[in-house]
Amino acid sequence: MRHRVKKKHFSRTAEQRVALMRSLARSLILFEKIESSEAKLKALRPFVERLITLAKKGDLASRRRALSLLPDKEAIRKLFTELAPRFEGRNGGYTRIVKLPNRKPGDSTELAIIEFVE
């Protein structure tokens, strides 16, 4: 039963949600800072933190698992060679979400920025 099991659907099918998370995660890893709606970034945060924890292990199985979650070789290379060593001494909490003013001319969406903690 699905009692009290909640997740954001973003008016998308399951495949579209997976594609959205992969796309946002790829952009965050490559550019290290992205702007989007607050709800999307709150859903993205655990996905990216799981990838960084995998990258900190650094073995072949972790690399293959990360490639299955995020099939982009350039992003995985940066994740394992640049980001994982940066967060070696940190146990979680690799990202920060900073709220921005709402989008005024359109739908008044709550915007935010997600970035890596230095």
UniProtKB/Swiss-Prot annotation:
Please give the family membership noted in the entry. Belongs to the bacterial ribosomal protein bL17 family.
The gene for this chain is: rplQ
Xref: InterPro entries: Ribosomal_bL17 (IPR000456), Ribosomal_bL17_sf (IPR036373)
**Record has Ribosomal protein as a keyword:** yes
The highest taxon in the source lineage is Bacteria
Recorded GO molecular functions are: structural constituent of ribosome
Q: Which UniProt keywords apply?
A: Ribonucleoprotein, Ribosomal protein
Q: What is the lineage of its organism?
A: Bacteria, Pseudomonadati, Aquificota, Aquificia, Aquificales
Q: What is this protein called?
A: Large ribosomal subunit protein bL17
The record's subunit annotation is:
Part of the 50S ribosomal subunit. Contacts protein L32.
| A GO term from the CC aspect | cytosolic large ribosomal subunit
Question: Does the record's keyword annotation contain ATP-binding?
Answer: no
Q: Which GO terms describe its biological process?
A: translation
Output the Pfam families linked to this UniProt entry. Answer: Ribosomal_L17
